[in-house]
Amino acid sequence: MLTIIIPSIELYDEGKEEFIQTKPQELRLEHSLVSVSKWESRWHKPFLSKDDKSIEETIDYIRCMTLTQNVPPIAYTRITNGNLEEISNYIGSPMTATTFHDKSKTINREIITSEVIYYWMIALSIPFECQKWHLNRLLTLINVCNIKNQPAKKMNKKEITNRNRSLNAARKQALNTRG
């Protein structure tokens, strides 16, 4: 979870003809499957696409991420560039120590929506409570489950020969024989 503070600003009230000072607003945010699902239901397009989001779409996603109750709508208009950078860094953070070293990285052109991720969760028996996790952590868990569920990779002839050679050498040394 990320907590940001939207700073106070001074506004002019034309009706009363006076300046008023707004209060700082604390927002607790969570980049999760739940927030992505809310955003996609409003905008009718995939959140996880390569397309850039408009400022309106970005601010609305921040609304979808918000866990803080009763936030006045005007607070979202006061979000600073510093707040946006902090949120962007939080969204991009892996939130896990797990890394992948897949040499045969293929580009998947499948459009990923929240429903596709929910399908993956069901197919892999991942509990629905994980929908509230940071999205990158959930996607890492899905990737780990996919890797662990794959059958063991078959060795080619060269790998088998090298393995047998090292096993034979270890046996010769353990039994003090020449072969």
Question: Where are the model-predicted features located?
Answer:
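Alpha-helical oligomerization segments
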Residues: I142-G179
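Short, hydrophobic/proline-enriched secondary-structure or compact coil segments at domain edges
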Residues: E56-T68
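An amphipathic, hydrophobic-aromatic interaction surface with interspersed Lys/Arg
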Residues: M1-W43, F47, L67-K154
